[in-house]
Amino acid sequence: MDNNVDTITLTDEEGKETEFEVITKLDIEDKEYVVVVPKNEEVDEAIALRIDNNDNGEEVLVPVEEDEEFNMVAEAYELLFSEE
């Protein structure tokens, strides 16, 4: 995923599209992640997504659902933004 992406549009299982603002991209243990927030909604929680490749080699965004992996991303995010 390009580092200069400001927004992305994701489609859920029901076909509903939602635009997200990309807060940051993180590289952790040979994996790439993006942290996003819904662009036009009043939500304080960020969403962590892992960048994977599908069978065709195309990048896909996968929600981080495992607690250990989520905590690792959250820690890196907090460390990055605590330095600012």
UniProtKB/Swiss-Prot annotation:
Pfam families linked: DUF1292
Domain of life: Bacteria
Family the entry assigns: Belongs to the UPF0473 family.
Name this polypeptide is given: UPF0473 protein CBO2561/CLC_2432
Protein's organism: Clostridium botulinum (strain Hall / ATCC 3502 / NCTC 13319 / Type A)
Taxonomic path: Bacteria, Bacillati, Bacillota, Clostridia, Eubacteriales
